[in-house]
């Protein structure tokens, strides 16, 4: 650890120390740095060129052998330890015959031309990745069978920095649900709850493919790209925005979500529904998931007496039920404990790079169809309900059962969790828009036994209703009768 601290202190390039590091490389002619490097092809010069995140120098030539060995540099960039060298082209062009006549060597003049990466005196002499350059996904999936379901869930939580000891299964699932936007494409998650529950930890600390918008502030151009940006001269960020360059975009405080562009919410709704958006004359598609986080300043029961659970959103959103209908799952943040030292693990888990790369690679897979092997969704589901539940189910299954080896009861567990998250959205829509969203009794039917039909409820509203509004399962009935003490009571009979 002391060696690691020393290397980081001496070699890590801080943005405010870039010029000092450049000077040190120039003076010493060779120096080792730690920085994030990204490579791309310069098709006009037929070379690979590299740029650095913190070291403020012009693009340099990236040797082809490094790109072939570590292709990750071409897509997302990679943190590396690099041996940098400094020598000018003039130093290579000295007059080799000058010493024959006892004359001092004089550098030859360099032909005038536009300077390019080849002319940059900074060179990459050697390179070693300090994050996983590639992931053997099949190997990780193959290890799943060595763990029980509980052990695997605990491994995931410890890999994210949480200590699962003492947690109930439902609490563990809440923490796992926070990872679903990292592993599922075009997934829309909302989590509102008390302060201090670590809502932003996963997106800020665990995955380099997620970006956290502090205060929820952004612009339409930042989120979706500039209008009519030139394909040749604009960067990828300028053309497609955050949703085209990140796997997950998180709005850290929904109360601060304000857009000056009046069309921003319409663009956002279109993207949340289909993963596409238009900027000027061009149409783009992206697969970034969206997370909306915020605080609820009162108890859930008090909030529900006067308004709905989307109330922390700004007024321009609260008047738009179509926006909230596009949210796939509402995570009940009030059920998550406030972060304490005993909730932070000191046990081993997967290294952060491994967990984040696992999630990124698993985004390519689709597990939504696994519901159909065991259950059928009931008639209260509309298209958006089904999309939301299937994507939540798929994301949870990718995390907990990546080998696709799942039994009926485990499938029931994550299906009921997924339905509850979507029903919580619909219950708020029923409060906001009334009759349009009355079909809230989401549930499922056993594929082998159609008589086994179940409705899934949300905990915060079931507490206030003695007899649920939804149709009961066959063989279940509520009745009023006298007790042995001659008092009237409500009884539930189950056959």
Predicted regions and their residues:
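Basic/aromatic-rich interaction segments and small domains that mediate binding to polyanionic partners
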Residues: 482-495
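Phosphate-sensing "switch" segment of ASCE/P-loop ATPases
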Residues: 283-290, 295-400
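Terminal-proximal interaction/regulatory segments of ATP-powered molecular machines
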Residues: 435-439, 443-477, 486
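Conserved ASCE/P-loop NTPase catalytic core
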Residues: 163-302, 307-311, 325, 447-460
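Charged, alpha-helix-enriched surfaces in structured cytosolic catalytic cores
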Residues: 16, 20, 32, 147, ...
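Extended, charged/polar low-complexity intrinsically disordered regions
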Residues: 1-160
